[in-house]
Structure formats: C-alpha cells, structure tokens
UniProtKB/Swiss-Prot annotation:
One of its GO terms (molecular function) is L-malate dehydrogenase (NAD+) activity. Keywords: Glyoxylate bypass, Glyoxysome, NAD, Oxidoreductase, Peroxisome, Transit peptide, Tricarboxylic acid cycle. The lineage of its organism: Eukaryota, Viridiplantae, Streptophyta, Embryophyta, Tracheophyta. One of its GO terms (cellular component) is glyoxysome. This is Malate dehydrogenase, glyoxysomal. Homodimer. Residues 1-36 form a transit peptide. Belongs to the LDH/MDH superfamily. MDH type 1 family.
Amino acid sequence: MQPIPDVNQRIARISAHLHPPKYQMEESSVLRRANCRAKGGAPGFKVAILGAAGGIGQPLAMLMKMNPLVSVLHLYDVVNAPGVTADISHMDTGAVVRGFLGQQQLERALTGMDLVVIPAGVPRKPGMTRDDLFKINAGIVKTLCEGIAKCCPTAIVNLISNPVNSTVPIAAEVFKKAGTYDPKRLLGVTMLDVVRANTFVAEVLGLDPRDVNVPVVGGHAGVTILPLLSQVKPPSSFTQEEINYLTDRIQNGGTEVVEAKAGAGSATLSMAYAAVKFADACLRGLRGDAGVVECAFVSSQVTELPFFATKVRLGRNGIDEVYSLGPLNEYERIGLEKAKKELAGSIEKGVSFIRG
C-alpha cells in the first residue's frame, strides 16, 4: 500500500493533466522560463509580428515558426494573442514563441528584435475605398512605429499594412521625428504583386511559377503596380492582348480575391506566403548571404518620387543597393507615368498625416 502523501501527489499530477490551468500570458511567454531547461532555440534571428492574431498574421506566424533562421518569435496583437501563441508554440520547430497582448506589452514585444513584420490593421472589404482604409490603418501604423523607434530602432521593418503607398511614408516620418530613421531598414512589402505576376505569367507561358521571375515596380495599389513584362525571366515575348490581360490582372489581383470572398475577407493566405518569402529574404541578407534580390517599396532616387518599388539587394544592414528600372518599352513607359502620378498623391497623404 502506497503512503498517503505519495497517493495524493499522484492524484494531483493526474488532475493537473486532466484539468490544466487556463492559459495566461505570463512573463510575456508561453511558459515560465524557470520551468524550461532550454533557454532558446537554435541560433538565429529574433522576429516580431505585430498584428499576429489577424487574418494575415496567423498564417504568417505559423510560416515564420517553420523558418530555421528564426530563433525567437514574438507575437503581438491587441486581441487573441494568447490563443494564437499557445497554438503555434506547440509546433516542433526551433523558434521559441512568446505572446504579447495589448498596448501595455508592446515595448516588451519589440525589445531586442532583429526584424519586425507589420500586418496589423483592418482588411479591405467590398466597397471600401483606399481613403477608408487609410483613416483606420494610418493611426495603427503610427503607434506601432513609435514603439519600434523606442525599443528596437536598428531592426529591419517589413511593412504590410495597407495602403503601403501611404503607410511607408508614415513610418518614415515617425522614425525621423524620433531621430532613428534609416532608409535602408524600412521596406514596404510588395512581394504579393511579384508572387501574383509570377503565377499569372507562368499560366500564360505554360511554365512552373517557381521558374518565373517578374519585376514589379512602382507601388502597391491599382495602376501604381507596374509589372515589367519586358524583363521577365526566362526571357519571353507576349502579344499585346496578353500584356493587357496580365497587367490588368496583376494590378487588380487584390480586388479579385476580395470579390471572390464576398465580404469574408481579403487576400490573407497568399499575402502571408508572400510576406514570409520576403521576410526570409531579409533574414538571409542579415545572415550575409550574397545575391539576395527582391522587389520592395523603399526610399528611392530611381524616380523623382521619395519612395518607389524596385528591385533591391538585401544585406546585413537591410538594403545594400537599390536598382534602377532598366530598359522599358513604350507600354511600360506610359504605365510608369500613370503610376507616378497616382503614387505622388499617396505618398504626400502619408507624410501629411504626421506633419499635419
């Protein structure tokens, strides 16, 4: 017969498994560190996702947890962060996951981060104009960037929150006010335009999308999205009908998804995929890998506009080089002028939001 204390201890252990305590955000971590033998995952980079419980944030967080370059993954949101954190933390990959809930935990979420990815904000819905989107998301981006300026001013920032053509200038102005602005470290994520372009062009050419690369320049909305089909790799020729079709579909890919979801959301899954693809490129650049080149909306002197999406080479300091547009055909030159006209107003709108 077992001693009474041993029996009681055994019952307590079984009861703890059958009735686990309600999950709480303790010390901004899934587990108290004192209860864990391991203090961290494999060597790698510290990444924060701001807006991790949203439609983009959740699949983005899951995919980032799978990235072997990530050692610590901080998930921040104003709602539902505990549940997302608990769920993703059960994945048997190297990154240690910690969750942060609400404005009061933003600073802890950001401290010491190497890369900050921002999908926070409201999604686009049918009938919603870019102005509607701007009014809500501009304030969110401002608040989050103020936290970055204070807690991790040297982090690379990947900004997804729309409208990117305006939110990137907002972020730049916030960082300038704080005295922490480094144009090499602020990148608007336009990778979804490239991903769509690769997919749609591959369909027309009958190729595997993974073997296709289409530079997409300009901005990240409507006519500001300019696919350079004359520079497609592998080199390809298109009829004018194909050029018109591809350009229109790439520019309106977001609307295609919004309408297909019929009010149930926007492009969340493909956006998360594109965001992780771009974040991985940034991490490979930070690691020192050579030849990491992607398109992004960045501070630029390629045109007369202060921001523009072009190919950039990524390195240990963020952007190592911003590439020129290269040779354009007549169709692309006309598209470029349309893009610049639209883009100028969007950039000014973002700047004015901070400067007043």
